[in-house]
UniProtKB/Swiss-Prot annotation:
Quaternary data: Monomer. Interacts directly with FDX1.
Organism: Bos taurus
SUPFAM superfamilies associated with the record: FAD/NAD(P)-binding domain, Nucleotide-binding domain
Domain of life: Eukaryota
Stored PANTHER family: GLUTAMATE SYNTHASE 1 [NADH], CHLOROPLASTIC-LIKE
Keyword Flavoprotein appears in the UniProt entry: yes
Enzyme class, UniProt record, top EC level: oxidoreductase
Species lineage: Eukaryota, Metazoa, Chordata, Craniata, Vertebrata
InterPro entries, alphabetized: FAD/NAD-bd_sf, FAD/NAD-binding_dom, Ferredox_Rdtase, Ferredox_Rdtase_adrenod
Protein name: NADPH:adrenodoxin oxidoreductase, mitochondrial
Binding residues for FAD: 49, 70, 78, 114, 399, 406-408
Residues where NADP(+) binds: 185-188, 229-230, 241, 406
Membrane topology: Peripheral membrane protein
Protein family membership: Belongs to the ferredoxin--NADP reductase type 1 family.
Amino acid sequence: MAPRCWRWWPWSSWTRTRLPPSRSIQNFGQHFSTQEQTPQICVVGSGPAGFYTAQHLLKHHSRAHVDIYEKQLVPFGLVRFGVAPDHPEVKNVINTFTQTARSDRCAFYGNVEVGRDVTVQELQDAYHAVVLSYGAEDHQALDIPGEELPGVFSARAFVGWYNGLPENRELAPDLSCDTAVILGQGNVALDVARILLTPPDHLEKTDITEAALGALRQSRVKTVWIVGRRGPLQVAFTIKELREMIQLPGTRPMLDPADFLGLQDRIKEAARPRKRLMELLLRTATEKPGVEEAARRASASRAWGLRFFRSPQQVLPSPDGRRAAGIRLAVTRLEGIGEATRAVPTGDVEDLPCGLVLSSIGYKSRPIDPSVPFDPKLGVVPNMEGRVVDVPGLYCSGWVKRGPTGVITTTMTDSFLTGQILLQDLKAGHLPSGPRPGSAFIKALLDSRGVWPVSFSDWEKLDAEEVSRGQASGKPREKLLDPQEMLRLLGH
C-alpha cells in the first residue's frame, strides 16, 4: 500500500486488528521487551497540553516512557498553528518541548490520527495509561442565515491559513473589500484584526506563510470592526493585545465614549488585571490624545473599532447572492449580575456593510472515538481531575479536559495536574501492572494499515528545510504546507 497522509477511505473498509487482552498481550510484551519493565504511557496530541503532560511524567517518574501521537506530520499544535506570527516570543516554548521530545524516554509519532488510524481501545491495550490532549480542532458555528456565503470564515481557519496549517492552505480569503467584521472580542479576534491591519512590511520577517503575506500585500481592507454581544466589562481579550492594537502603525482606534459611561465607578473593585484593561480602554475612548498621538491618528490610513451590545442575526448577501456584503446585528442590553450577565435583544437591529466576516466566538473539541465519552454541550471529555469518567486508565488534559479557555501557562498548570493524578494512580496500583508492548505493537498495526509515522528526527529534517527556505528572504522559516511534499522530503 502506498504511503499516505490525508485519509480518504472509511475506517470500516479496513480489517481491524485488535490486540488481544490478557495472556496474548502479556506474551507480546515479553516478546518485544527484554529490558526492565517500565510504565508505558501514551499521549494523544503534541500541542502544549500533550508536551506539558509528557514533561511532568518524565520528570517525576524516572523510568516512565511516553509516546506522543499526533495527527499532523509536525509537532507543537497551536504553538505552531495558532500563535500569531508577530508573537515569536510566545513560540519560544518550543525549545522546552524539543528537549522533552529528545529524551531517550520519549518518542513522537506524527501523521497518526487516533480514532482513524488506530483506536483509543487499541492504545489502551498497548499502554498502561493513555492521556487525551488533542485540543479543540473545531470552531463554534454562528448558526445564522448566510453563514455559508463566500466571504464568511471562522477565525480559526483564517489563523490556520496565515500560520500554515495544511488543511487551511487553500483558504484564499478575498481581501478586496474595504471593511471586515470580526464577531467576538477575545484575543484571537484581536490577533486577526492586527494581522489584517498591520503593514505587510512589518510581517515579512516573521514566519507567516508567503501566500498569506502576498494576499495581505494586495489587501484593500481599511476598516475592521470587532463586535461583541455584551459590553466593555465583558471583553475577553487581555491588555497586551489591546495595547498592540492601540499602537499599531498606520491605524487609529474608533471607540464610542458613550459605551463607557459610568464605567469608571464600576471598575474600582475589579481585580487588578481587569481594572488596568478597563482603564486603558477608558483612556483611549474618552481622553484627548497628545499632540504626537493625535498627529499619528490623523495620518492613519486604516482604522479599527469595538462595537458593543451587538449580536449577529444574519449575513447579508450581495445583490447577486454570490457573496457576503454585510451583517445584520441585533442591538442588545445586559441582564443579570456578575458571571450571570447575559445579552438580550432590545428589538432594534442595524445593518453593517462589509465584504469579509470572521467568526471568532470560540473553539470546540470533537469526539475522538466512539469508545470515549464526550459531552457535546460542553465540548469536553467528561472527567474528574483529568480521569476520564468510567474509563479506567484513560486521562485527559488541556482544552479537551476543561474547554478552550486560558493561555499557554493555564494549560501548563492543568497538564501538570493530570500528570500528577496519573502518577498517583500508578503508585496506588490503580493501573495495570503487567508489561505492555507500547509503540512496538502500535507501529506494527500502523504498518499493516499503510500509515507512515513521522518521528521527531524526521521533524527535525523538515524543520531544517523550513529554516533553510526562510533564510533566502530573511524569515525565521518558510513553513511547509503540503503534507505530500513533506513525506517526499522524508523519502516516504
